[in-house]
Amino acid sequence: PTSVTESALTRNHTELMLKFFGAELESKETSVTIWPATELFGNRIDVPGDISSSVYFVAAGLILPNSEVLIKNVGINPTRAGLIKVCEAMGADLTLLNENHGNAEPTADLLVRTSSLKACTIEGDIIPTLIDELPTIAMMACFAEGTTVIRDAAELKVKESNRIAIMVENLRAMGADVEETEDGMIIHGGKP
């Protein structure tokens, strides 16, 4: 067998797909072991919607008055679904419907209703599970009551551009009260 140990927990889409096609592998936290396969088998794949693409509709549904938005068949893989946890921490009215764990990837329909959001702290192990959603989450925090702190997101400074600085600049351009920090930002809500 071949074993790989990573320094941090990462997305597990490849491991799930290989198992779905019959590969023998074992995942434990940051380690994956795979045994040689003589044959993999085809299987029907239902490709779910990307949670990163759904974040805009989630945000609109939470912020716009008298909204109810249903987003069908969204991937809710725990290595990617930090958005759901942050929405829960912010007091969002977000419900998972029709959860399905029978495919290679877990899916659900997301039902979102207008909510009075509250500030929260977003840090640590959840950051890699929502790194692509952070710009929209930061915008949502502008509408939340209280001060939202985002930290441990220094990775955003070294992607295609310094996304922390760009987020802060754009949030300020729309009138938000936001401070840039070394590895994230502080957003004082109630001032979109």
Regions found by a protein language model. Name each.
Residues P1-P192:
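Short, structured segments at the rim of ligand-binding sites
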